[in-house]
């Protein structure tokens, strides 16, 4: 059932809230929580919809800060009724995958644990390590996150030595393959010396390794090697033999060997305190530990069973059925374990058991997982203590009324005024929060080639960042992204420019601002002619330096990106009828000017917005008669 989207939130209109709750049935199903813009904040499931949704708005119900923030934004509730709990779980999983709501991530986005990504969306997919899961293309596959980064890098290194794979994001040469092809590390995808089908077949074998199916892959390769030998194709047989040896070496390097190698199983456990919750999931295949995944969750969100239930739902939502093990070992019963087991069975195509182990070998495995979860918790607490110490020290140095929960850092990057850009980075509780980072293109016409003006650029950025607070000061109290401290990369001049703008906007009292100069690591405060006397090794100063360095890095990388885009577009600007929008479409499709130059008329016409006549203009520009 779907309702109308209204501007007032439900907690501001209790009559409408109560009427809305009465409309929701006491049946299994899926519910949607929307904000005033109609965006889905959260998708959930329940065997009793009304009871579950009402719990969010019950005054006596304790909510974590994250969930409380979500509830304050809810303006509408929608729901879909299902026949069974299993149906609601399957529907919830599909809807979350489709809409990716902001508050549906129980697991925190911790960048220290990397993933393996295979870009199946590309004609010749790449495989690489990344610390961020992107949802731009549903065809791409992510495996992980992996706790042991060194082992992961070694594994990928060994795989690339065993199987010929694409090595570069872009070709090194446009008319010939690079050295990787000559030494057998790459099949020459840049020159299309292998068909996409054959290349994908190779990559499917690699994917089996990260799915925990190395034993199955070894059996397949052994069969192929025997067939090649019988057909007198000894070169192919030798290639497969080398691949088998590489995989066997990889298998030997696994650190833990376990009995009962006939069953694939995952074992999960957590360790938590009032502030932190660390989850470890060990993947055991053919009696060997092939993967160790780590997750962080909101420790205030639920009890142990509820957290584990949600973690498993989120984890197995992102994996293929063939990757789901036959058995999952748990430290406790799950609140909806039967529903989860039914959903996993449907996805895998065979029975999946959720077990609280009684046998000694399984209990020992689970104890090892719990021990690792506790170790990660202690490590996280030590890191949090260091961050807290830095914040406390910084508050003392700058005489702040409270700890700076949100710190923002700003920097300008340009080359003699050309392509001037700015960065805005954010640190939450002393930790970089790159999901809140922002780029700014400087629009001031006085900032141009040959005339750089960092002061004017910073003034423009600060004016744009705080405009909505100057227009309506009430926004400050209602905002969840107003900074406790603003750090400017620069000296007294840069700080004075920012202070002047904040004064014009009547925000000088509300915005605490400092600057940090690079040369001597000097900290300047508004109204002070001399820098603060500090020790560069103080925790608070080191935190400011991290913010400053991150703002600088982010600004420089964006400036470099803008220069590259401008240099590519400069040639395209000369083509009649090719505007900015179609230039973007061309570059998005072909990725480089060289590929556009080499494209045929038919290939050019495949680009969105490029008709026959414009394709001829582009082709003739690069191929003059």
Swiss-Prot record:
NCBIfam families with a match to the protein in the record: PRK00558.1-5, uvrC
Q: InterPro entries, alphabetically?
A: DisA/LigA_HHH (IPR041663), GIY-YIG_endonuc (IPR000305), GIY-YIG_endonuc_sf (IPR035901), GIY-YIG_UvrC_Cho (IPR047296), Hlx-hairpin-Hlx_DNA-bd_motif (IPR003583), RuvA_2-like (IPR010994), UVR_dom (IPR001943), UVR_dom_sf (IPR036876)
Q: Do the record's keywords include Manganese?
A: no
What keywords does the record list, in alphabetical order?
Answer: Cytoplasm, DNA damage, DNA excision, DNA repair, Excision nuclease, SOS response
Q: Where is it localised?
A: Cytoplasm
- State whether it acts alone or in a complex, and with which partners, per the record: Interacts with UvrB in an incision complex.
Q: What is this protein called?
A: UvrABC system protein C
Domain named UVR: residues: 215-250
Family label: Belongs to the UvrC family.
Q: What does this protein do?
A: The UvrABC repair system catalyzes the recognition and processing of DNA lesions. UvrC both incises the 5' and 3' sides of the lesion. The N-terminal half is responsible for the 3' incision and the C-terminal half is responsible for the 5' incision.
Please cite one Gene Ontology biological process associated with this protein.
Answer: SOS response
Query: Does the UniProt entry include the keyword Cytoplasm?
Result: yes
Disulfide bridge partners, by residue number: none
- Gene Ontology CC terms, in alphabetical order: cytoplasm; excinuclease repair complex
Molecular function per GO: DNA binding; excinuclease ABC activity
Location of the GIY-YIG domain: 26-105
């Amino acid at each position: 059932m779907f309702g109308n989207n209204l501007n007032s939130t439900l907690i501001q209109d209790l009559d409408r809230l109560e009427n809305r709750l009465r409309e929701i049935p006491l049946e299994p199903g899926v519910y949607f929580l929307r904000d005033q813009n109609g965006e889905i904040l959260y998708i959930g499931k329940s065997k009793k919809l009304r009871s579950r949704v009402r719990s969010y708005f019950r005054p006596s119900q304790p909510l974590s800060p994250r969930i409380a923030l979500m509830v304050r934004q809810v303006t509408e509730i929608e729901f879909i009724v299902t026949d069974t709990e299993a149906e609601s779980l399957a529907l919830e999983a599909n809807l979350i995958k489709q809409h990716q709501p902001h508050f549906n991530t129980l697991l925190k986005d911790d960048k220290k644990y990397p993933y393996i990504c295979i870009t199946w969306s590309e004609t010749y997919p790449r495989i690489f390590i990344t610390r961020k899961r992107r949802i731009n293309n549903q065809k791409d596959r992510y495996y992980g996150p992996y706790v042991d980064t060194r082992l992961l890098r070694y594994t990928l290194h060994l795989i690339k030595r065993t199987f010929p794979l694409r090595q570069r994001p872009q070709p090194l040469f446009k008319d010939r393959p690079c050295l990787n092809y000559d030494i057998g590390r790459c099949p020459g995808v840049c020159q299309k010396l292998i068909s996409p089908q054959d290349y994908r077949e190779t990559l499917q074998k690699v994917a089996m390794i990260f799915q925990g199916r190395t034993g199955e892959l070894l059996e397949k390769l052994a069969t192929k090697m025997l067939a090649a030998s019988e057909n007198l194709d000894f070169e192919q047989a030798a290639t497969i033999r080398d691949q088998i040896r590489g995989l066997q070496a990889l298998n030997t390097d696994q650190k833990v060997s376990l009995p009962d190698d006939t069953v694939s199983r995952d074992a999960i456990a957590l360790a938590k305190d009032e502030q932190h919750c660390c989850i470890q999931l060990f993947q055991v295949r053919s009696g060997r530990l092939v993967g160790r995944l780590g997750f962080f969750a909101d420790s205030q969100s639920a009890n142990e069973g509820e957290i584990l239930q949600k973690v498993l739902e989120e984890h197995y939502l992102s994996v293929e059925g063939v990757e789901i093990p036959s058995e999952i070992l748990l430290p406790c019963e799950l609140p909806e374990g039967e529903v989860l087991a039914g959903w996993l069975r449907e996805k895998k195509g065979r029975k999946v058991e959720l077990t609280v182990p009684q046998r000694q070998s399984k209990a020992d495995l689970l104890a090892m997982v719990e021990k690792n979860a506790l170790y990660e918790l202690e490590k996280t607490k030590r890191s949090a203590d260091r961050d807290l110490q830095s914040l406390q020290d910084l508050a003392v140095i700058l005489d702040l009324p409270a700890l700076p929960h949100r710190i923002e850092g700003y920097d300008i990057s340009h080359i003699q005024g050309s392509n001037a850009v700015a960065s805005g980075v954010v640190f939450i509780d002393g930790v970089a929060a790159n999901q809140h980072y922002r780029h700014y293109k400087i629009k001031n016409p006085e900032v141009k080639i040959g005339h750089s003006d960092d002061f004017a650029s910073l003034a423009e950025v600060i004016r744009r960042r705080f405009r909505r607070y100057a227009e309506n000061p009430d926004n400050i109290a209602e905002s969840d992204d107003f900074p406790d401290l603003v750090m400017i990369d620069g000296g007294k001049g840069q700080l004075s420019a920012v202070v002047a703008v904040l004064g014009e906007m009547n925000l000088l009292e509300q915005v605490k601002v400092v600057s940090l100069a690079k040369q001597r690591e000097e900290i300047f405060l508004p109204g002070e002619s001399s820098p603060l006397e500090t020790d560069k090794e103080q925790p608070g100063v080191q935190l400011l330096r991290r913010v400053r360095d991150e703002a600088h890095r982010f600004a420089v990388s964006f400036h470099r990106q803008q220069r590259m885009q401008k240099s590519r577009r400069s040639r395209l600007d000369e083509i009649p009828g090719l505007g900015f929008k179609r230039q973007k479409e061309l570059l998005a499709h072909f990725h480089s000017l060289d590929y556009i130059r080499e494209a045929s008329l038919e290939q050019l016409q495949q680009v969105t917005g490029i008709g026959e006549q414009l394709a001829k203009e582009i082709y003739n520009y690069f191929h003059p008669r």
